[in-house]
């Protein structure tokens, strides 16, 4: 009898533990929100107590009360309701819930938001008219409003590259949603294809390095027949479906090379092959700097929403063909507008970024900008006028992967001190 009783108590104990784990106080609160369509528990960083992948109902058109809806994916990593919240605005799909640098610095909770029209956050009927920075900012505002019911500490929004741009657009439309913004390597393009990119590529680094880049590009084009064969071999062996014919792809790779070289900073000037190197050496170097994926049908599909945004509102870049005109047979102008899907209508709104830029320069506050000095996107970085307390930090020689940890000494200390002052709290120094 006693054995049966002990067994029964053990079963109750196990059941109570299991129930408490699946029905934490946070989970109960999340389930009570009518805006949440789906919740799935996930593994998250060990410094967090709980982690969830959540689908949130959002209107396709926030300006229309009768709008159709879609579900937007977010990742929530929970530590403590009273701690700060780092609100990560992705520019594309969100495929991970890893803890960001900023969340470690602030010992913060974290929400990562997938951008509308990317990943799992795509409306059923793809209407490009509702892919705007304002509609995306409305998405973010709705999520902030919802989770501020739970998290009472300071809020900081942040993002990297296009995600950093998205951080700034969110702050522009809803300046009081967060206390501080930390956009990483976020360009503010002021034209459909911003000409400042050309000026940057003609002045970054040393003249010797820029000349070596150009000579490599010309050599790559000059060995067209051999390079084409190598490209075809890779396509066949890797079952790669390119978005264009082989000659167009190799020309496109050539034009993109200088932008990618400085953007990623993974190749040193001394590593660039000499013009008399074999076609195979030239080709392998090009692939390492310009992964073939970016020229495939799959990449065009994955990045289609970005190209729609770029050419309708947030801007992009083109190429200077003049150094290669005598070697090009497929590409007749330097525009990238051919990347936009045929289903999208292009009508560039030149005033959109002008308004954002003016606000960032004159009215914004508590924004910490992180840039890499050699990153091509630094060409169109925000230009502060000293009319607010925003801080722009540029890592000398830094590339598109520049972070707070990339800085040293007094520069890094200034970043930590500024964050601590704006948030009124002590911050971790990584």
Feature annotation, model-predicted:
Residues 1-25, 201-212:
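Bacterial Sec-dependent N-terminal signal peptides
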Residues 10, 169-306:
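Alpha/beta-hydrolase
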Residues 21-109, 408-410, 417-430:
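Catalytic-loop region of hydrolases
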Residues 55, 61-135, 339, 345-366, ...:
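N-terminal cap/lid subdomain of alpha/beta-hydrolase-fold enzymes
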Residues 130-149:
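Alpha/beta-hydrolase active-site loop
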Residues 151-161:
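Alpha/beta-hydrolase fold nucleophile elbow
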Residues 159-163, 167, 171, 375:
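Gly/Ala-rich beta-loop-alpha elbow adjacent to hydrolase catalytic centers
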Residues 263-430:
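C-terminal subdomain of alpha/beta-hydrolase-fold enzymes, centered on the catalytic histidine
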